[in-house]
């Protein structure tokens, strides 16, 4: 593997959290996005699987905005990244709350699928969006139309905001997040900084996508310093991401405090 699965889990969660802090440096240390990510991750670790009622109770998801709901499903995408059937089923279980708002359901599926492809090292910028449209399996939704526009603009190396901002708010946020991520896919620093300059997208989603793809190893050291000094739940999120990997791989011991876990692919034994 290009990067360890643990580093990619770290990258996704830290990327989202640090992007939020860079976007809103005046916010308190206890970041809003951490409050979205930690409860769902804790539920998965405690139960060893996704249970809808536990998830909804911990997150109070009906009180979330559509974009917050998309971000809150990131732990699910991490946990079920290697099984697309379970991934889709569990994401839809959460998304079904908005059964009359297909763009929210499509957004949850789109981000979840992209995270999964990054973690399995099957994310290719030129083919990701067509694969997402197929995974959503609901043609002619507002989001799939916008994503297809993004695909065309990426192929043409064209600017994007003037072509996308006429759409609804969550459609705009998700479509632009994919544009900023895919147009500079190997550079988390540039992807996030470009997204911050746009009032129409979510830099947190860009940070999660790029963090999963590039791993924590490629998060700039200056950002890590910001995280160490200004984000109070960083250590908790890192521990939770390690626990998520351990539960996913079947080596988690709920009676032991895991300080550092070496994890290989399932059914493969490797030294630390």
Residue positions per predicted region:
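Structured, active/binding-site neighborhoods that engage oxygen-rich ligands
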Residues: 1-272
């Amino acid at each position: 593997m290009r990067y360890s699965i643990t580093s990619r889990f770290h990258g996704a969660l830290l990327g989202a959290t640090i992007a939020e802090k860079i976007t809103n440096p005046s916010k308190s240390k206890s970041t809003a996005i951490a409050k979205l990510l930690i409860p769902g991750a804790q539920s998965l670790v405690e139960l060893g699987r996704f249970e809808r009622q536990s998830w909804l109770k911990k997150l109070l998801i009906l009180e979330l905005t559509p974009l917050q709901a998309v971000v809150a499903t990131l732990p699910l995408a991490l946990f079920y990244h290697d099984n697309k059937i379970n991934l889709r089923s569990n994401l839809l279980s959460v998304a079904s709350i908005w059964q009359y708002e297909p763009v929210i359901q499509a957004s949850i599926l789109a981000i979840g699928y992209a995270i999964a492809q990054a973690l399995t090292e099957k994310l290719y910028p030129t083919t990701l969006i067509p694969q997402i449209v197929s995974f959503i399996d609901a043609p002619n939704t507002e989001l799939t139309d916008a994503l297809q526009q993004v695909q065309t603009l990426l192929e043409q190396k064209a600017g994007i905001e003037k072509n996308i901002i006429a759409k609804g708010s969550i459609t705009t946020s998700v479509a632009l997040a994919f544009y900023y991520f895919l147009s500079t896919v190997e550079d988390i620093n540039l992807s996030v900084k470009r997204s911050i300059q746009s009032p129409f997208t979510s830099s947190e989603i860009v940070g999660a996508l790029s963090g999963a793809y590039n791993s924590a190893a490629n998060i700039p050291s200056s950002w890590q310093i910001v995280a160490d000094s200004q984000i109070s739940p960083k250590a908790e999120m890192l521990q939770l991401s390690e626990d998520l990997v351990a539960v996913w791989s079947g080596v988690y011991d709920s009676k032991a405090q895991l300080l550092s876990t070496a994890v290989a692919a399932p059914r493969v034994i490797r030294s630390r």
